[in-house]
Regions:
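Alpha-helical transmembrane segments of multi-pass inner-membrane proteins
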Residues: 56-87, 97-167, 186-191, 298-301, ...
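Hydrophobic transmembrane alpha-helices and their immediate junctions
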Residues: 163, 281-324
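A membrane-periplasm/extracellular boundary helix in multi-pass inner-membrane enzymes
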Residues: 144, 165-214, 228-236, 244
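Long extracytoplasmic/lumenal interhelical loops at the membrane interface
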Residues: 85, 214-228, 236, 240-281, ...
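Transmembrane alpha-helix segments characteristic
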Residues: 5-20, 65, 69, 130-140, ...
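Transmembrane signal-anchor hairpin modules in multi-pass inner-membrane enzymes, especially those
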Residues: 1-28, 42, 52-58, 62, ...
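Membrane-embedded alpha-helical segments of multi-pass membrane proteins
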Residues: 1, 34-46, 101-110, 152-159, ...
C-alpha cells in the first residue's frame, strides 16, 4: 500500500509540474519561471530511489535537528550583524533566501525533530534532549524570521496530534505536548527582541484598518485585498483560471482603475497558495494541488495507524506533518 502511495504521490507531483510548465508556456515565461516545475520533476527519481533503498529512520531526525540548528545559527548570524534593527523589530532573518520560506522550513524541521520523541533508543534521555534542541532551534529560527503565517500549520499539527492522543487515551504524551507548546509560546512572548506582543497588536490594528477604512498599504491589509482580488478572478474563470500572465494583466488593469491599492503592484502572488492556484489555474489546478496534499497524507496516515513499532510510528508521523505543514503554510 505504501508503494502505491509513492506512485500516486509521484503522479500528483508530475501533474503539478506539468500544470506549471503549461502555465509558463501560455504566459510566455522562460528562465527562472521554470525553476519550480523543474525542482518538482527532479524529486521524482529521488522518491523512487528512497522507496527502494530507504535510509535508517534515525538519520531523518539527525538531519532535522542539524538542519534546525543550522537555521538558528544563520538567523543569529544575520541578527548579530544588525542589532539596531533587531531592537526595533525591523530585522527578519531570511537565510539568504526569503524570510517567509526560511521561517517555514525552520518550523517544519522543528516539528519533525519532535516527532522522533518515542523512537526507541538505548540512551533515551540523551536522545530526547537532542530532539528538544532541534525543536527549540527551529522555533527560535522561525521567530527570528518574523514569519507569522506559517504558525497556522503548527496550530493545525498540534491540534491533530492532541486529538489523536486523546482518542488513543495517551494522557502522558498529551500533557507533555501541551506543556511544551505552552511554555514555548509563553517563553517567546517574554523575549523583547522578538517583539511578539507588538506584532500581534500591529496585526489586529491592520485588520481593523482594512475592514473600517480599506487600508491595503500594510502587510495584513495587502494580503486581505490580494485574497479578495484573487477570489474574484477565480469566480470569473473557475475552470482553468487566468494563467500567470492573465493574472498580472488583470492586476495591472485593476491598478489603473484604482480598484486595488498601488502597494499591490510589487506582488505577483496573492500570498495564499490555494487562491493563487485558483485564480491562475482554476479548479483543475486546485484539484492537482489538493492531490499533492492529500495523497501523501493518506499514504503516511494508513501506515501510521497500522504501525506497531514506536520508531516506525514516529517515522510515519514525521511524514504526516509535511503535507499538513505545507497546507498550513499556504
Amino acid at each position: 500500500r505504501f508503494q502505491s502511495g509513492i506512485k500516486n504521490t509521484s503522479s500528483s507531483f508530475a501533474l503539478l509540474a506539468l500544470c506549471w510548465l503549461l502555465d509558463n508556456w501560455i504566459s510566455g515565461e522562460r528562465g527562472s519561471a521554470l525553476e519550480k516545475p523543474i525542482k518538482i520533476l527532479i524529486t521524482l527519481p529521488c522518491l523512487f530511489y528512497l522507496a527502494q533503498r530507504p535510509p535508517q529512520s534515525r538519520w531523518l531526525w539527525h538531519g532535522a535537528v542539524v538542519g534546525a540548528m543550522g537555521a538558528l545559527a544563520i538567523a543569529i548570524f544575520q541578527a548579530s550583524n544588525h542589532m539596531d534593527l533587531v531592537r526595533i523589530g525591523g530585522l527578519r532573518a531570511n537565510g539568504f533566501t526569503n524570510a517567509i520560506q526560511f521561517g517555514n522550513i525552520a518550523l517544519l524541521l522543528a516539528t519533525i525533530s519532535l516527532c522522533g520523541w518515542n523512537a526507541a533508543h538505548s540512551r533515551e534521555n540523551l536522545w530526547r534532549l537532542w530532539l528538544i534542541i532541534g525543536f527549540a532551534s527551529g522555533i527560535l529560527a522561525s521567530l527570528l524570521s518574523g514569519s507569522r503565517g506559517g504558525w497556522l500549520s503548527l496550530v493545525i499539527m498540534a491540534g491533530l496530534t492532541c486529538l489523536y492522543l486523546i482518542l488513543t487515551r495517551r494522557w502522558r504524551p498529551f500533557i507533555l505536548l501541551t506543556s511544551i507548546c505552552s511554555l514555548t509560546v509563553i517563553g517567546a512572548a517574554q523575549v523583547p527582541q522578538l517583539h511578539l506582543q507588538e506584532r500581534i497588536a500591529l496585526a489586529q490594528h491592520e485588520v481593523q484598518a482594512y475592514q473600517q477604512r480599506g487600508e491595503a498599504n500594510t502587510s495584513i491589509g495587502a494580503r486581505l485585498q490580494m485574497w479578495e482580488f484573487a477570489w474574484q478572478l477565480y469566480k470569473e474563470k473557475p475552470l482553468l483560471g487566468w494563467t500567470q500572465s492573465g493574472y498580472m494583466e488583470q492586476k495591472r488593469e485593476a491598478l489603473e482603475e484604482n480598484r486595488v491599492d498601488p502597494f499591490l503592484n510589487e506582488f505577483n502572488h496573492p500570498h495564499n497558495e490555494l487562491l493563487d492556484t485558483a485564480s491562475k489555474r482554476g479548479s483543475v489546478g486546485l484539484m492537482i494541488l489538493f492531490a499533492i496534499y492529500f495523497i501523501p497524507f493518506r499514504a503516511f496516515w494508513s501506515r501510521f495507524i497500522e504501525a506497531k513499532h514506536p520508531e516506525a510510528k514516529a517515522a510515519y508521523l514525521s511524514g504526516l506533518v509535511i503535507p499538513i505543514a505545507y497546507f498550513g503554510f499556504g
